[in-house]
Amino acid sequence: MNKLRFLISLHGNQNDFQVAQAQCAEATARKLGINAEIVLAEDDPVNQSTQLLKAIQSQKESRPNAIVLEPVGGTALPQVAKAANAAGIGWAVLNRHPEYLAELRRQGRVPVFAVSADHEEIGRIQGRQFAALLPRGGSVLYIEGPTRSSSAQKRTAGMQETIPSNIQVSMLKGNWTAESATRAVSSWLKLSTSRSAQIALVAAQDDAMAMGARQAFQQVADDQERARWLSLPFTGCDGQPASGQVWVRDKLLAATIYLPLLTGIAMEILVAAIRDGTQPQEHSCTTPVSVPALDALVAQRS
């Protein structure tokens, strides 16, 4: 069999999880002995669609055997998926479980499946972290991912399942990047309501946004006010060994949630499916883990 060629389509390189996803894809390609081309959509769903269609519509000898896609927009590019399927290109979706997968799988030509983090459970863990860090209750400033993101919506829903009634949450919107969170928090700080909010914890749906929030508070002009904000616990999510876990050890974050990288998992499933001529399980989830463990957080605050 000729060396397999995979196209890996990711959001961009503006947060640590996306960078780690790309690095994981490169390492997995070396391990599996396949070629992997990584393309970055620069957080633009139209750009992502155009990049993928160009590859799908290229000469047969230069087409990828499979595409691994982490969708930027609210949909997982159903028309592009159909074009890939018609061209005999495998299709793996990361962090979504789109409805169109079942239809494409019934056609049975190539592997079609999804691998995602368990976003509801991520949210539930965040809610439990809040309870551990604020045993007497209080107010949380919570930075969500973009409105279009089902991952963000599910994390929020999970968090709301597990926070106790003595914790109130004020929500801001970010775009998974440090810069977006810095802008959101800086704008919020200009509102009179920010001064009366009595925030006791700052949380974000990823580590990059949590660190971006810290950056906004570092820019507060008043020394006493700045020190008060920076003394609060900050929590995030992604928990990669080279970023989020380091920030926890350095006490820049009080907690994060470790998420296994998805690109390598999807690539391994694709290689096995292509070589064995099988159709993988339609959807599988990875397991998130609190860092530090929840009982350790409780012990820190008791």
What are the functions of these language-model segments?
Residues N2-L4, I143, S151, T162-I163, ...:
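Hinge/cleft segment of the Venus flytrap/periplasmic-binding protein
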Residues R5-C24, T28, A36-L53, E70-T75, ...:
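Extracytoplasmic "Venus flytrap"
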Residues L69-A87, M159, S170, G174-V246:
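Hydrophobic alpha-helical
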Residues Q79-E121, P241-V246:
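Flexible loop/hinge segments that line or gate small-molecule binding clefts
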Residues Q48, L52, F113-V140, A181, ...:
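Hydrophobic alpha-helical segments within soluble ligand-binding/sensing domains
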Residues F17-L32, Q51, I122-Q126, S150-I167, ...:
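Short, solvent-exposed amphipathic alpha-helices that sit
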Residues R30-P45, S139-Y142, Q160-T182, S231-L232:
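Short beta-strand elements in bilobed, periplasmic/extracellular small-molecule ligand-binding domains
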